[in-house]
C-alpha cells in the first residue's frame, strides 16, 4: 500500500476522493431519519378511553427495545457505509494505479525500441535533421529551424511538462557561431557521461533510419560507463572535429545479473547496415543502453599473427649467405624470375593456429564461475601429461591394477614396460604421498599415482618384479637356443668337406703367386684373406682370383663325378685325329662344369647353423645368465619388503618365491651349458686360425665363413651363366686361357680328393 501511494497520481484523483467523502457524510443522515419515522407514526393515534391502561403497562416496555434496536441499526449501517467507501476507494486507487503503470510502460517500451534500431547513414541523417522534427509516441519533442541564417533549436523537457501539465511549451536557443556551438556541445558532454542518443525523425514503429550516435570520447575509453542514461530526452549535436579531453572515470556501478550481449562489430566496407537484433526485454534493453563494452583488441595482437597483420608461419632454419658483388651468382637471377607461390595455401599448411583466440561477440557470454578449476601438479607438467597419456593407453582401471599387484597376476609384458617407464622417483613418490589436500583437485597422473601408492606403497618395485617374471621365459629360451646354434655351427666347421678343399686351393694358389717373396711358402693364412680374393684381378681384367679358384674346384668335383661313374665299366682309348681330340676335350670341360656346379653351389646349404651363429651377439650370450641372476636377487629384496606391508600381499609373495626358486635352478644349468659351448667355440676358432681369439670377438669366425660362402654362391651363378651362353652360341673355338701363372701338375693331389669326404679325427 505504501509503494502504491508513492506513485504519482492522476490529476483527477483528488476530485474523485472528495466525491466519496461527501457520500459518506450524506448516507448516515438519511439512515437516521428513516429509523425514527416508524416510532413517530405509532404515537399519533391516542384514545381517551384506553390511554391510562396503555401508557402504564403496554407502551412503556416497548420503548426500550425500539431505542436499542435503532442504535444497533444505526451502527451497522454506519459500519457498512464506511467499509463500502473504503473498499471502493481502494479498488479505485488500484485500478487507476494499474492504468497509470500501463501507460508508463507503453511509453518506456516505445523509447527503448527507438534506441535499438540500426544506425542512420550520414547523408540521410543530415537530410532528416534539416527537414523535419522529432516525435516520441506522437508528441513533439524538439524542432530545428533556420531563422535568417541562424540554426535555432527548440526543445522541451518532458518531465517538466508532465509536472506542470504544459504540453506546448518550448524553449528557444540560438546558436550564433561554431565556437558557441562547440561550447554548448562540450557543456552537454560534461553533464552526460554516456553515449548521446539521437531520436529517430519518424515514428519508432515505421522508421527505417534509427541510429545511436556515440560520443568520440568514449570510443577509445576502456572504463565502465554510468549506470543510467535518460532515453526520454534527446540532443542533436554536430560532430566536433577536435574531440574534448576525456572526462574523469565514472563511479563503478553494480552490473545487472544477466548482462546483454555486446553490439555487433562494425564492418569496414560501406555496404548496407546489418538488420537490427531482435527486441530484448526491458531490463536487458536498459542495461545495454546504459553500459557499453570497450572495443576489442586489434587483430595483430593475437598469438597467431605478427605485428603487421600477417599470419605467423613455422620458421625454416638456414644460414643466410650474402651475395658476392665481384662475380655473378645463381641467386642474382632468382628475384627476377616468374615463379610465385600460393600464399594462402602456405599459410594453411605452415601457419600457426592462434590458441585461445575469441571473437568479440562471445567474449562476455561466459561467466567466470563456468571455468574449470585449476589442477594441482606435483610432477613436472610435461611428465605429468606423458604419464596421463600412458595411463589412458593401458586399457585397465586403477582397481584392476591394484588387484593384480596384490594377487600377483600375470601382466602383458608391454603393459609392464609402459608402467615401468612412468615410474616416479623416490622423491616424487614421497611428495605425492605427503599431499594432504583435496585429491579431486589433483591432475590425472598425480591422482592415479596417489591412490596407487596409498593402496600399495611398493607398487613400482612389485611391477619390476612382475616385469622380470614376464621377460624371464623368453630370455632364457632365447639364450638356450643361441647356445644350441653355436654348438651345431662348430660341428659343421669341424667336418672335412668341400670347404676345406676350397681352403687348400686358395693356399696353394696363394703360395704360387707369392713365390720368391716373404709371403710365400705359407702353411696357413688368416681367414680374413678369404674376403679379399675378389679384389685380385687378372691381367686382362676379365676375371678374379676367386673366380679362378672356384672354377677349378668345380672342374675338379666334376672330374671326380665322372671317375666314379666309370669305375664299374671298362674304358678303352681309341686313336683319333687331333681335331676330334680337341672337340672331345671341349665337351669334357663342359661336362665337368655341369657336374661340379651343383656340388659347389650347394656348399652354403651345408653351413646353415654357421650362418645363424654369425648373427648371434657374443656379449649378449655371455651376459644373459649374469643379468638373470642379478634381477632374481633384486626380486628377492622386493619380496622381503612386501612381506611386512599387509596381509593382502601374502599371495604375491608366495607366487614370486615359487618362481624365483625355479629361476635359480634353470639359470644354474644354463651357466654350465654356456661354459661348455663357449669353450667349444674357442677350440674351433683356434683350429682354423691359431691365436686369433685374443682381443677379438670369438664368434668372428662364423661371420667370415658366412660372407665367404655368399661370395662363392655368386661366382657359381656367374659360371653357370657363362656356360649357358657358350652352349647357346655353339662355338667350337678354343676357350682363351686364363693368364694366371702356370700351376704345377699336382696342384690338386689325389690325397686331397680322397680326403674330401672324410672328417678331421685329430681335432
UniProtKB/Swiss-Prot annotation:
Q: Which gene encodes it?
A: FH4
GO terms for CC?
Answer: cytoskeleton; plasma membrane
For this chain's UniProt record, which GO biological process terms are given?
A: actin cytoskeleton organization; actin nucleation
* PROSITE patterns noted in UniProt: FH2
The annotated topology with respect to the bilayer is: Single-pass membrane protein
The text of the family note is: Belongs to the formin-like family. Class-I subfamily.
Composition bias (Low complexity) maps to 281-292
Span of the secretion signal?
A: 1-33
Q: Where are the transmembrane segments?
A: 80-100
Biased composition (Pro residues) is annotated at 240-280
- PANTHER family the record matches: FORMIN-LIKE PROTEIN 4 (PTHR23213:SF354), FORMIN-RELATED (PTHR23213)
The FH2 domain extends over 303-738
Q: Which organism is it from?
A: Arabidopsis thaliana
Q: Write the protein's name.
A: Formin-like protein 4
